[in-house]
Regions:
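Juxtamembrane "helix exit" motif at the C-terminal ends of alpha-helical transmembrane segments
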Residues: 40-54
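Hydrophobic alpha-helical transmembrane segments
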Residues: 52-64
Length: 160
């Protein structure tokens, strides 16, 4: 039972890192699109002020870049960012609870008690992930998962 609990704890920590990296990636995408819209609008306005012809073309380009900035909250990475932040915070709290319980497990702890905790923590993790995210909101990213596994390994090396 100790081994099963340890694997569940490890899985929760990997999940925590995974959603942390997803939030970072989504925030990066958000920043990049905002910067592109800002630079495009500035460049178009500068060009429009210097060019006396084709004002309509420059006005359309400025408006289109502003529309992209306006509809940016509707892009999927905006939802990913907010959902990943909430999931990360809650799963990280769950990992803290699991770590506190791991430190209390001793030889006198029964397998039944450990099994109940495994079920309890699994249910909590499922509820956290299902509450904030739909299945299609977070497409699998092998790169982020590998990075999360690597960071979890570093974390658990320091825990022992």
């Amino acid at each position: 039972m100790y081994q099963r609990f340890w694997y569940k704890f490890y899985d929760a920590k990997v999940s925590s890192y995974y959603f942390q990296f997803y939030a970072i990636s989504a925030r990066r995408k958000k920043t990049i699109v905002s910067a592109i819209c800002l630079l495009a609008t500035s460049a178009f306005l500068l060009q429009m002020s210097q060019n006396t012809t084709n004002h309509l073309v420059w006005i359309v380009l400025v408006i289109s870049s502003q529309l992209v900035a306006l509809f940016q909250p509707l892009f999927p990475y905006e939802k990913q960012y907010h959902a990943a932040c909430y999931i990360y915070e809650d799963v990280n709290q769950l990992c803290s609870e699991m770590e506190a319980y791991w430190r209390t497990i001793g030889a006198e702890t029964s397998d039944e008690e450990i099994n109940q905790k495994i079920i309890l923590f699994s249910d909590k993790q499922d509820k956290i992930e299902n509450r904030f995210a739909t299945a299609d909101l977070f497409p699998q990213s092998q790169r982020m998962h590998a990075k999360a596994v690597k960071n979890a390994d570093y974390y658990f090396r320091g825990l022992n």
